Every structure is written in structure tokens, then in C-alpha cells.
A protein has these predicted regions:
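Conserved NAD+-utilizing ADP-ribose enzyme module
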Residues: 1-179
Length: 179
């Protein structure tokens, strides 16, 4: 049970949990590391809030896109988490600069906020660079809310200042469904 893993070839006494970026590749190699494999797709939030911290807690490493021989890349899970955060933030910033706007969801009482999964006492403002992503979240408790387009200069000058005063976080390109 759990994630597929192999013994680390670089760090004695440590296991490497195998993760793939492509479902077809994972399915192709799953039978060589497990007797009854099941492919599980993790969201970015699950990876950052649960999977990678759990691997770190159990002193396991991350092996990326294993193709049957020696695990070429073995990463510390928290280092990998930080790399994921930086890559996602970079992509978000590039998209926002291109659109010159940020999209949020708001109702009659202000912006939609969520509980942070990485900082339990914090609230997060989910926002998107792509309006289609924001509109796709208008279901469940958010179905009566509106997608709001905020010019980038206003988002930086006003919205980020408001979030800072309130002690709230920003959730760029939030991907885990409706509120």
C-alpha cells in the first residue's frame, strides 16, 4: 500500500518514492514496482499540503519520471515542493503580465476566500490569470458569485495591500475545484 518506492542508490537506508508527470508513463511502469498497482493523480495542492510533507516526515526521497533502471533524480521532498511553488508562481506571473489582469471570484460580501491547506489559520484569495479558469469554478458555494477582472496595477496596488493588512495569502492559479 502507498506510493511506489525503491531503495535509494545515493543515500543508504533511504527509500525513493516514484512519481511520474505523465499518467501513461506511470501506467506503463507501475507493474514493475507493484503487484496490484493503482495510478493516483495528485493535485498540486495535495502534493504541496500532504504528499511531499508526508514523504519528508518519513525521510523518503522523491524520484521523478522513473523509467525502469536507476532513479536518476532523487530530490528531498521539501526541496521539490519549493521548486514546484517557484515554477507555478513564475508561470502565473508571466500569464498575468501577458493578460495585464488578475481574475478573482467575488460575492456580495467581497472576494471568495478559502482556508489555507498549508497554513491552517490562514485564508487564501484564489486568483487566476485565465478568466476561463475562474469561470470554471462558479459552482457549488460559488455558483451565485461573479468573476471579477482586476487590472494588474490595481491588483498590485490595492488588492495585495488589502490582503497584507488582513494577513491573508494569495492562491495563484488555484486548481482544486469550486469553493
Amino acid at each position: 500500500q502507498g506510493l511506489a518506492r525503491r531503495e535509494s542508490r545515493r543515500m543508504r537506508g533511504r527509500d525513493v518514492c516514484l512519481l511520474w508527470s505523465d499518467e501513461a508513463t506511470a501506467a506503463r511502469w507501475a507493474h514493475s514496482v507493484a503487484s496490484n498497482p493503482r495510478i493516483k493523480d495528485f493535485s498540486l495542492t495535495e502534493m504541496l499540503a500532504s504528499v511531499l510533507p508526508g514523504l519528508a516526515q518519513h525521510r523518503r526521497l522523491v524520484g521523478l519520471d522513473w523509467l525502469g533502471d536507476e532513479v536518476i533524480v532523487e530530490l528531498d521532498p521539501m526541496d521539490f515542493a519549493e521548486r514546484l511553488r517557484i515554477a507555478c508562481l513564475d508561470a502565473f506571473v508571466r500569464s498575468v503580465e501577458k493578460m495585464d489582469a488578475v481574475f478573482t471570484i467575488e460575492g456580495p460580501y467581497g472576494p471568495a476566500l478559502l482556508r489555507s491547506q498549508t497554513k491552517p489559520e490562514g485564508l487564501v484569495l484564489p486568483c487566476w490569470a485565465n478568466p476561463g479558469e475562474a469561470y470554471s469554478r462558479l459552482e457549488g458555494p460559488w455558483r451565485e458569485m461573479l468573476v471579477i477582472k482586476t487590472p494588474l496595477s490595481d491588483f498590485i496596488g490595492e488588492r495585495l495591500a488589502w490582503l497584507s493588512r488582513k494577513g491573508h495569502l494569495v492562491g495563484p492559479d488555484y486548481q482544486d475545484g469550486p469553493g
